[in-house]
Amino acid sequence: MSFAALKTHAMSRPGATVDIKWGADWVASVGGKMFFVAGPEPGPCKACSFKVDEHRFLELTGLHGFSPAPYLARAKWVQLSDARALALAELRALVGRSHELVLQRLSKKLQRELMP
């Protein structure tokens, strides 16, 4: 499994847009709010970060390959530095859940516009 597979999955989420922020970080957003960060660009990705449910934050940060995401940990974001930490299906589910968590915080009107 590679970080590229997670980036592809993030891009496939409904309403997802991609941008390069802070000079080199690849950011997937929904409704202007980021839900997945990988970097740097260009070059091979060495880590990615995404939002998780509050009840999963401590569990995940206790696993090898996961840590609290710099600058975003208080918002329950984790950083994944080892793409082999979990099975691809579970990592894809976590990225999908990150998208859902951010989407839920958007206005109902914007949610309707973004969802097919």
Predicted regions and their residues:
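Charge-dense, helix-prone N-terminal extensions
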Residues: 1-116
